[in-house]
Amino acid sequence: HIVASEVGRIVENAGAQALTIHGRTKDQGYRGEADWDLIAQVAEERTIPVIGNGNIREASDVIRIQQETPCSGLMIGRAALGYPWIFRDIKHILEHGVAPEPPSIEQRWETIIEYTRRIMARPFREERHKDLCWMRPKFIALTKGMEGSRKIRGALGTVVQIEDLEVVAEQHCKQYSESS
């Protein structure tokens, strides 16, 4: 039983200033497609801003959703974890009407390494966070879709220190760089 409209009414009547809807059921979890028709329905029914979330994987999804729904805003979730450049792409497509060129392999690695440096500069309470082993799944997500990314997964699985990551990046760039 889908209760989004009812919950939207209750939330608004309780004084909420905005409402975010993830367009999937609990049983769906992260599987399947978000129900943007349902999100649009709730947005039409409510006077508070409704922020839609689900299946926003690339910049063109934002344009489509803006055209198809009365949502006041959108929320990006897992797509940003694997492709943080989505925000750059969205800004570009909103300003210019077309998606930008994807970041080069070098640009992606620069971002990944800078992100890793910033994460590792933070104080950690747990000893298990002192090396990069716990970030290996994040590296795989961040390199997904890059040319040759499947071939470097094994190397990413051995990364312990930032220097290891830099070696993987350098070798990957050398092999697949657009400038070579």
Where are these regions (language model features)?
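Short, small-residue-enriched loops and turns at beta-alpha junctions
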Residues: 25-32
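Short beta-strands and strand-loop turn motifs
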Residues: 20-24
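Alpha/beta catalytic cores of nucleotide-metabolism and tRNA/nucleoside-modifying enzymes
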Residues: 3-18, 30, 37, 41-52, ...
